[in-house]
Amino acid sequence: GYGHFLCFMAPACAGGGHAIGLAQMLLNIHQTEMVIVVGMQETGPSSMQSFDALGVFTTDAVRPFDRHRSGLAPSGGAACIILESEYFYRMRMEDEDIKHTPLARLSGYGFSTNGLRSPCTPLASYESASMVQAIDDALLDEGDIDVILAHATGTPAGDEAEATAIKDSFTLCPHVVATKGMTGHECWMAGVSQAVQATLMIQHGFLPGCVGTEDNAFPDMKLVMKTMKYAPHNILCNSFGFGGTNASFVISKDV
């Protein structure tokens, strides 16, 4: 019984983030009232050989933002979220006996592309542009963001660019969470996984610690080293991909 629009997104490791952004666009222009966004990633020799050729895999542990970080560890799996318009939600609640509260709100999306400037090297200025656009799209100020769920794969160049982008985007750095020390880098599905992680943080009032990181290389960044109780309201999620494609989105507590 499913119909209407079907799309497969493949903009590298930003794919999940862009899929969420496209879903938001479809809802905003009233092309549909509900979107199922699925992120999937297979791991194995056939899917990882070309990735490995880039020389970005660690032979140690994943250490996001650590002074001794040496690369990423690929992982896979699947994650799924369902987005619906506020109008459709309210209409459905009037017709159904079972009531429920939305788990969270997708409030903003931003994107940028390095283009010909540096397609294979992360650039802080373009990552910052993606974050700022997501905050603006959510009709928020930078001070309204209380948590950043970072891309933070543990690569030397990638983490440095993101740390610089965060510093350039915020007058006061919010809490920064990096989960890939626990999950590995889920590649194409990472953005959807982040949406689930952000929702769980909002639901249960906590921020997970940065597993694998022992020596924060960026002391100006408010990196969450140990799991802590915290009640976030607006979480900015980053997904950046090889080829210079960047996606950021804001998950907010539904009020």
Give a label for each model feature.
Residues 57, 61-140, 146-147:
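Condensing-enzyme catalytic core mediating Claisen C-C bond formation in acyl metabolism
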Residues 1-22, 47-74, 157, 163-192:
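Conserved catalytic cysteine-centered active-site region
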Residues 16, 23, 51, 82, ...:
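Conserved small-residue
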Residues 42-64, 111-129, 153-165, 189, ...:
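Active-site-adjacent elements of ketosynthase-type condensing enzymes
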Residues 4-39, 74-95, 185-207, 224, ...:
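Active-site-proximal alpha-helical scaffold in enzymes
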Residues 6-10, 34-41, 100-109, 143-150, ...:
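Beta-strand segments within the central parallel beta-sheet cores of soluble alpha/beta enzyme folds
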Residues 138, 142-144, 221-255:
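Flexible, low-complexity linker/loop segments at domain and module junctions
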Residues 19, 126, 130-138, 165, ...:
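Stable alpha-helical structural segments in soluble proteins, enriched in small hydrophobic residues
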